[in-house]
């Protein structure tokens, strides 16, 4: 849907936005089934949560800041391709469903 190809899926499966290519047309905001994209008022570019991938690249952090900061443990992050990961086990144990059903091959789940 992006006319410039600014929206992409990284090798890690995380959707991102190349801010150097984004022209701020907002097409991706309108098309996003999760309604999670936001417009940066300063730059005009669209952005979204990148699960702290930028932070991890520079600091070596292994967990998203929101997961670390959540006092109730309501957020989890992990490798869905590893059946022994905590998140994979939690999804099986709770019969968690993808946030948008199977329509988008979502990797974000409602666990509880």
What are these regions (language model features)?
Residues 1-112:
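Non-ligating segments of multi-cofactor redox enzymes
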């Amino acid at each position: 849907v992006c006319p410039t190809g600014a929206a992409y899926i990284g090798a890690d499966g995380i959707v991102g936005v190349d801010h150097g290519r984004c022209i701020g047309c907002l097409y991706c905001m309108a098309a996003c089934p999760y309604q999670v994209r936001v417009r940066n008022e300063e730059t005009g570019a669209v952005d979204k949560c990148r699960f702290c991938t930028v932070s991890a690249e520079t600091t070596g952090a292994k967990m998203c800041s929101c997961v670390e900061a959540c006092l109730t443990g309501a957020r989890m992050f992990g490798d869905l391709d590893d059946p022994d990961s905590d998140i994979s086990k939690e999804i099986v144990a709770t019969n968690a469903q993808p946030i948008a059903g199977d329509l988008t091959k979502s990797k974000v789940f409602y666990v509880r």
